[in-house]
């Protein structure tokens, strides 16, 4: 039996070639886990003769799945790689749900509600005037129950208090309402696929379809996802799970790092292989990371090591306040940039909470440092995209009341509040969807003539788009729809600033282009399938990693990334670790979050904290984080004790570099 042709270390090679049963790969930060998954797929297909169509690799983000597909195509060739299922958990759940929708009580053309739409449904089901924060909390609780694989019919087992009991009663109404809309939320993609797999015939069908399963970022799985994997892997455990218990930082959204141990309990024959050689960071960074995370309990110990040399000492910088901290970071970036230590894109500034970014942005702008702030408004949350997506959702699923209400009078077509109220009343009386009510002459007969005519034209347009989108070219149907509603003219009326208008028009063009690309990938699919795929996406190709800019992002957002130079701001008590997490007993997860931040650095790492920070309009004294005490003193280089002199040097250094920039640009 031949072995993988690409160069692997001994532990990676063992993980790739092991097929004797279920396997857990404990892959430390920067140890090449994605490489192992790619090479194992190649090994299974080319060396073990398993058809690519029988192999599935599951990850958490569209970006990771896309990267995996591209790397597989480079190793297997496009034709073989296309046969392999590479998807997110939610995409896989969508495949199962769509294949067995009748068994689960759904009709064709299921809509997938995003977070905003789902929250709107919850708001409408709660008493009028319910505070927005209560709506958000109720929706979050429903999500937690679903992530724990609790269905609305489970006899209130999820409720732990009187408040939760009320939300549990809401759960059944919410589930019924979504079923009437022929819609699901993102959590349902896992929960409903679990329901389908309870059927033995369905389960056997999928176990035959997926003969080997590989799972990335396994430590981030929640209860529902774990059960899904168990059902697909079967009793013999045709599974390789790759994860790192030290990087489990999503407990707040249901992730259970204990799922690593549960694998051993459920599969006594489980093989465990550790990947401990780090290919990213220098030795000093790894020694600090190892020392920090050693304060957390471990079922299986591992210590990262590197052959890249020691690198720079870790700098710890006390600052007077957050403004001095931001100025210091900006000045240090300028210094490294202009002494040949790297380009703008080699620097990242990480922090615990989004609220820390404002003062950092200001400092970078003052020094004319180009930067990119991660975590802005999602493409699909933009008004123009939500409008057009709702038109298309309604075209493939006329039961989607949420979509109907958003677009029936957008752009304005003389269907006012009173007319919409009449349609809603008629729909409620006859227990039908809003769109079906709008198509009925008896409903429209009571409306003003102009409103009735507009509503009839609207319904005809939606029906025609749905029909053409399935029978003919779906992209032409989409373009004709957008032209027919004169959406571009509507945007021009609604948008005052030319720059903003052009951005919104470009977003519309990008949406059509994205649909075109999806259609070209699978030419035989109609609009219903295209919409299902599009609804699962969270970002577009145009949201590529920014080049040539300093990156500002939260610690959570930095996971999976690496940078030559990393600044970790706000390493203070009540911030890192966060006060709320300490109150909830989550100190270990906060330590893992710090560990993730440290291990993003390749060559240099700077940790900073403020001695006071402005909170709620007042200056509050801050203490250095307890995590600093857990780092070996010999690895740290503390900046001088005289803060005022240090801050003066910081300002002077920044001023010198700014003058250089002015000279460079001829100012």
Q: What role is predicted for each listed range?
A:
Residues 2-3, 20-23, 41-211, 237, ...:
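A basic/glycine-biased coupling hinge at the interface between accessory DNA-binding modules
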Residues 4-20, 224:
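N-terminal pre-P-loop "Q-motif" helix
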Residues 31-34, 219-298, 302-307, 425, ...:
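Conserved helicase motor core of SF1/SF2 NTP-dependent helicases
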């Amino acid at each position: 039996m031949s072995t993988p042709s690409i160069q692997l270390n001994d532990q990676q090679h063992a993980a790739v070639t092991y097929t004797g049963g279920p396997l857990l790969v404990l892959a430390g930060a920067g140890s090449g886990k994605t490489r192992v998954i790619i090479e194992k797929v190649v090994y299974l297909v080319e060396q073990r003769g398993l058809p690519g169509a029988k192999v599935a690799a599951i990850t958490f983000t569209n970006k990771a799945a896309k990267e995996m597909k591209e790397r597989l195509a480079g190793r297997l060739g496009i034709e073989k790689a296309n046969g392999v299922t590479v998807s997110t958990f939610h995409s896989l759940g969508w495949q199962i749900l769509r294949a067995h929708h009748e068994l689960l009580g759904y009709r064709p053309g299921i809509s997938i509600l995003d977070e905003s739409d789902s929250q709107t449904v919850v708001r409408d089901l709660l008493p009028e005037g319910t505070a927005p924060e209560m709506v958000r909390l109720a929706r979050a609780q429903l999500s937690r129950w679903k992530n724990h694989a609790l269905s609305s019919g489970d006899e209130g087992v999820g409720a732990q208090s009187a408040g939760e009991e009320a939300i549990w009663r809401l759960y059944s109404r919410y589930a019924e309402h979504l079923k009437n809309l022929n819609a699901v939320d993102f959590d349902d993609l896992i929960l409903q696929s679990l329901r389908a797999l309870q059927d033995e015939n369905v389960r056997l069908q999928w176990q035959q379809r997926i003969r080997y399963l590989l799972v990335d970022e396994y430590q981030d799985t929640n209860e529902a996802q774990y059960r899904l994997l168990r059902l697909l892997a079967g009793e013999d455990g045709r599974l390789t799970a790759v994860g790192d218990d030290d990087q489990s930082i999503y407990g707040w959204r249901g992730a259970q790092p204990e799922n690593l141990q549960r694998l051993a309990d459920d599969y006594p024959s489980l093989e465990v292989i550790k990947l401990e050689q780090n290919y990213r960071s220098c030795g000093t960074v790894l020694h600090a990371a190892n020392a920090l995370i050693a304060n957390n309990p471990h079922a299986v110990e591992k210590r990262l090591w590197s052959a890249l040399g020691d690198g720079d000492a870790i700098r710890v910088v006390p600052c007077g306040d957050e403004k001095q901290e931001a100025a210091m970071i900006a000045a240090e970036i300028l210094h490294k940039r202009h002494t040949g230590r790297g380009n703008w894109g080699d620097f990242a500034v990480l922090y615990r909470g989004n609220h820390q970014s404002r003062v950092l942005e200001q400092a970078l702008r003052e020094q004319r440092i180009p930067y990119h702030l991660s975590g802005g408004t999602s493409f699909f949350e933009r008004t123009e995209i939500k409008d057009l997506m709702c038109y298309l959702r309604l075209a493939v699923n006329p039961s989607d009341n949420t979509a109907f209400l958003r677009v029936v009078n957008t752009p304005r077509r003389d269907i006012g509040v009173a007319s919409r109220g009449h349609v809603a009343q008629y729909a409620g009386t006859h227990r039908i969807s809003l769109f079906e009510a709008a198509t009925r002459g008896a409903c429209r007969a009571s409306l003003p003539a102009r409103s009735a005519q507009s509503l009839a034209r609207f319904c005809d347009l939606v029906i025609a788009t749905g029909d053409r989108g399935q029978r003919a070219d779906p992209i032409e149907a989409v373009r004709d729809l957008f032209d027919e509603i004169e959406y571009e003219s509507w945007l021009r009326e609604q948008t005052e600033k030319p720059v903003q208008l052009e951005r919104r028009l470009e977003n519309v063009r990008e949406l059509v282009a994205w649909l075109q690309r999806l259609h070209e990938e699978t030419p035989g699919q109609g609009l219903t399938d295209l919409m299902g795929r599009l609804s699962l996406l969270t970002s577009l190709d145009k949201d590529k990693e920014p080049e040539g800019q300093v990156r500002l992002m939260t610690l959570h957002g930095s996971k999976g990334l690496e940078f030559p130079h990393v600044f970790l701001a706000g390493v203070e008590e009540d911030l890192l670790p966060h006060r709320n997490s300490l109150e909830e007993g989550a100190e270990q997860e906060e330590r893992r979050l710090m560990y993730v931040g440290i291990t993003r650095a390749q060559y240099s790492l700077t940790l900073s904290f403020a001695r006071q920070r402005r909170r709620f309009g007042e200056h509050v004294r801050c203490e250095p984080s307890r995590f600093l005490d857990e780092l070996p003193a010999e690895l740290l280089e503390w900046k001088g004790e005289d803060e005022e002199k240090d801050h003066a040097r910081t300002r002077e250094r920044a001023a010198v570099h700014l003058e250089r920039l002015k000279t460079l640009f001829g100012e």
